[in-house]
Amino acid sequence: MTVEQNVLQQSAAQKHQQTFLNQLREITGINDTQILQQALKDSNGNLELAVAFLTAKNAKTPQQEETTYYQTALPGNDRYISVGSQADTNVIDLTGDDKDDLQRAIALSLAESNRAFRETGITDEEQAISRVLEASIAENKACLKRTPTEVWRDSRNPYDRKRQDKAPVGLKNVGNTCWFSAVIQSLFNLLEFRRLVLNYKPPSNAQDLPRNQKEHRNLPFMRELRYLFALLVGTKRKYVDPSRAVEILKDAFKSNDSQQQDVSEFTHKLLDWLEDAFQMKAEEETDEEKPKNPMVELFYGRFLAVGVLEGKKFENTEMFGQYPLQVNGFKDLHECLEAAMIEGEIESLHSENSGKSGQEHWFTELPPVLTFELSRFEFNQALGRPEKIHNKLEFPQVLYLDRYMHRNREITRIKREEIKRLKDYLTVLQQRLERYLSYGSGPKRFPLVDVLQYALEFASSKPVCTSPVDDIDASSPPSGSIPSQTLPSTTEQQGALSSELPSTSPSSVAAISSRSVIHKPFTQSRIPPDLPMHPAPRHITEEELSVLESCLHRWRTEIENDTRDLQESISRIHRTIELMYSDKSMIQVPYRLHAVLVHEGQANAGHYWAYIFDHRESRWMKYNDIAVTKSSWEELVRDSFGGYRNASAYCLMYINDKAQFLIQEEFNKETGQPLVGIETLPPDLRDFVEEDNQRFEKELEEWDAQLAQKALQEKLLASQKLRESETSVTTAQAAGDPEYLEQPSRSDFSKHLKEETIQIITKASHEHEDKSPETVLQSAIKLEYARLVKLAQEDTPPETDYRLHHVVVYFIQNQAPKKIIEKTLLEQFGDRNLSFDERCHNIMKVAQAKLEMIKPEEVNLEEYEEWHQDYRKFRETTMYLIIGLENFQRESYIDSLLFLICAYQNNKELLSKGLYRGHDEELISHYRRECLLKLNEQAAELFESGEDREVNNGLIIMNEFIVPFLPLLLVDEMEEKDILAVEDMRNRWCSYLGQEMEPHLQEKLTDFLPKLLDCSMEIKSFHEPPKLPSYSTHELCERFARIMLSLSRTPADGR
């Protein structure tokens, strides 16, 4: 200690009180210190009561506030502007001529900004803001309660919930609990923390503990956390249900008015509970005066506060857990840390003490697990609600903390002074460079090099005529322009205008007349072709031009050299600053990024997930509730740095890179092999997990039995239908009906195809003297194949697709095997419908005989069937697309969406096999996206109406048609338009959070938003594909041509 103990106590008390006052000032917007101190005194230091007291007091005078607002908004009302509660004391005249008032206003503004900037790294502030936010939500949603099934419904098929091999296990969202999943998964993947929890044993005297210990629910929570961790280790399920642990947390987190706390406070509370639970165990197992607590050893460190308070020096050692950092105003993590470690002047509550105050923080002991809270929320006093800060903040995978250690403080101070000196010099250089890059004295400025170049170009230009104005006047009016004598005079124009307009004031008539005579040269005439495009000097001698060019060239070269030198100097300084801490002595304390907790949304609502580094596989994993997927550093950066969309990191968890015990696996003492899965569990948890796995195995067996029984029933039903269909087909053929529906038919032998086949056979028989059926068949097949090849190679407009006309065209374009095409053509000429034509009967018999002679080894029947199945799917996809686009044009967006979704999915599957297997993917994607946007707009308008029936209809549209299909747009990250469309839809609904609405509407919105913001890529089950009507090839081609023609007539911005 460098001062007496009472000075330190006074410092701590004043700092604590000042912190509370700063929090109240920011939350409530009240700047009067006396009012704030009185509120804090009346509430006995309770921040929540103080906020409630102040907000209730302000709420009593809404009319006065409204009046004040309009007085400041209307320029003609008053010359004075009232600012918060200082309207009577700090009135500044900004409309008069007194420059002192203006300077005073600027000074006050800067002082307020600097004060807010200095108040960084205060966890209580975060919590207070969160409480105000939650109070607002609680008032609107009226203590909303939700059942787990409203958020997520388990698939009836247990195989959808089965864990794949040793894949990481997810956590089920049981009602806005994505925050729980993100935090717990981050801690679970710290192997040392996992071991501590799994091997925890409650104190033997747990029943004898004081009643308040049980009220805290530490031991029940530890029991449920052990069970949860055990399931995460050894379950056979894809995800597990954390409901029991969550319920204990929710009960403990509810205050008297049922407000639920924020995620940061949840993490604090979680570690506090764990610390208490392990403290009880530690005290039982040791007789030491201060037993070691493994939670404290793992997550808590110490720093030394060194500073000056009212002119007196002090040093004080403090313990810290999660380290809070402000984001606003900083570009990377080191800048945040620098600002948090160096505090500026501390405001004194006693005005008579004028000594300067300030302090530095130096880490003396860092925890193995170092967690940074990134404060991305601030209270907007103008709007009266918290707002999220979306600014970009970069952070490294390896963070070196040597510069913040107490043992390095002398060298760090030297380096900080050097960096400050370099930054000051950098500012001077940048200002010099700016003078070169933005040259001029007017509002428009240009690079000086360009100015000199333009001057050189002007001087070198050659004049064509003496006066461009005279030249234009002298030239005759070009074709299409109006001769001057035909234009009405100014008086005539004014008279015409006056006669057409209603009676107006003289000033408005004068304004109209002044505007009516404005000459518009670029719309009233065209420039003669011989007029020079650039101006040029009228008179300049060769000597003058030579001197001027020489000077301009020389000056331009000088400026280019100066600019280059400045840019190189600036780059060198930047590089020097970046490498300031890169020497070996300052990279001895490496911390590696272990987990990043991400929040997407606004201050009032959003979704949480986590990126966690898999140290065994050396890759990043994304934990998003039940979905656990492989990820990458690039994806993490895109979602976590901020500045893009609404997602950004709110918590960073670093681990000591030299503390390998944190991530080291356990090994079998006998075999030396690493223990995996259920082997790592204590006996009691092993029995618990095995019992749960047996229940799940039984569920799988019951499902298999149900499927087997269902398959048997379907098989019996199918055989019965087959017998009935064979009877009906025989009856239809006997009736001589040549045209039938082609959906189930592989040969697609419709009326128009039958006529084309007959024409080909007739043509082939006329070309050969040998009229034998086999000769005619061979000739006909050659002619038909040549015709189809020509169609396949023809360049057609979008409305004509010959693949729809004939299956062989589809095969040719997709390079099907020759044997597949030959057999398909034989089936065309061997179709039984040709038996009704005397000219083709014998040809059909020969074709059928050839088909029967084809051996299985000559044509792969499975491949043959697969090609025809793909063609059937192509026709179905076409029909889905046609109906979807027709409904879209009729503005029947729900029906359109269902068909377009099926079209897109089928088409994507086809295109994966070949470029010409399906339709234009971008076209289908565009209308699918537009359909979702239109439906979202309709639903939002229904919600805005406020009518219960309309609101419910709007939410039904969102829940039934928008939310289930959003993952389809997010699957392909390369489709930027789809991702932006999803962001637009989400932002539309998030924008309602800042609006006043009825409590029941706020409740519905709060219930619905987590589903909309769920970032899970897992595609949940949705509506069955709509049934297609029966259609002929002719109808299919005709409707396709009609809809594509209508699209081609749609303007580009409408497609």
UniProtKB/Swiss-Prot annotation:
Residues 541-578, 684-717 form a coiled coil. The modification Phosphotyrosine is found at residue 740. Gene3D superfamilies: 6.10.250.1720, Cysteine proteinases, DNA helicase RuvA subunit, C-terminal domain. Pfam families: UBA_8 (PF22566), UCH (PF00443), USP_UIM_N (PF21909). One of its GO terms (biological process) is protein K48-linked deubiquitination. Keywords: Coiled coil, Cytoplasm, Disease variant, Epilepsy, Hydrolase, Isopeptide bond, Nucleus, Phosphoprotein, Protease, Repeat, Thiol protease, Ubl conjugation, Ubl conjugation pathway. Residues 77-102 are annotated as: SUMO interaction domain (SIM). A motif (Required for SUMO paralog-specific binding) lies at residues 89-95. Residues 476-496 have a biased composition (Polar residues). One of its GO terms (molecular function) is ubiquitin-like protein peptidase activity. It catalyses: Thiol-dependent hydrolysis of ester, thioester, amide, peptide and isopeptide bonds formed by the C-terminal Gly of ubiquitin (a 76-residue protein attached to proteins as an intracellular targeting signal). Residues 14-57 form the UBA-like domain. Changing residue 586 to V: In EIG19; uncertain significance. One of its GO terms (cellular component) is endoplasmic reticulum. It is found in: Cytoplasm. Its EC number is 3.4.19.12. InterPro entries: Papain-like_cys_pep_sf (IPR038765), Peptidase_C19 (IPR050164), Peptidase_C19_UCH (IPR001394), UBA-like_sf (IPR009060), UBA_8 (IPR054109), UIM_dom (IPR003903), USP25/28_UIM (IPR054108), USP_CS (IPR018200). The modification Phosphoserine is found at residue 85. There is a cross-link at residue 99 (Glycyl lysine isopeptide (Lys-Gly) (interchain with G-Cter in ubiquitin)). Acetylated. Homotetramer, inhibited form. Homodimer, active form. Interacts with ACTA1 (via its C-terminus); the interaction occurs for all isoforms but is strongest for isoform USP25m in muscle differentiating cells. Interacts (isoform USP25m only) with MYBPC1; the interaction prevents proteasomal degradation of MYBPC1. Interacts (isoform USP25m only) with FLNC (via filament repeats 17-18, 20-21 and 24). Interacts with GAPDH. Interacts with SUMO3; the interaction sumoylates efficiently USP25. Interacts with SUMO2; the interaction sumoylates efficiently USP25. Belongs to the peptidase C19 family. Deubiquitinating enzyme that hydrolyzes ubiquitin moieties conjugated to substrates and thus, functions in various biological processes including inflammation and immune response. Modulates the Wnt/beta-catenin pathway by deubiquitinating and stabilizing tankyrases TNKS1 and TNKS2. Regulates KEAP1-NRF2 axis in the defense against oxidative assaults by deubiquitinating KEAP1 and protecting it from degradation leading to degradation of the NRF2 transcription factor that is responsible for mounting an anti-oxidation gene expression program. This is Ubiquitin carboxyl-terminal hydrolase 25. It comes from Homo sapiens.
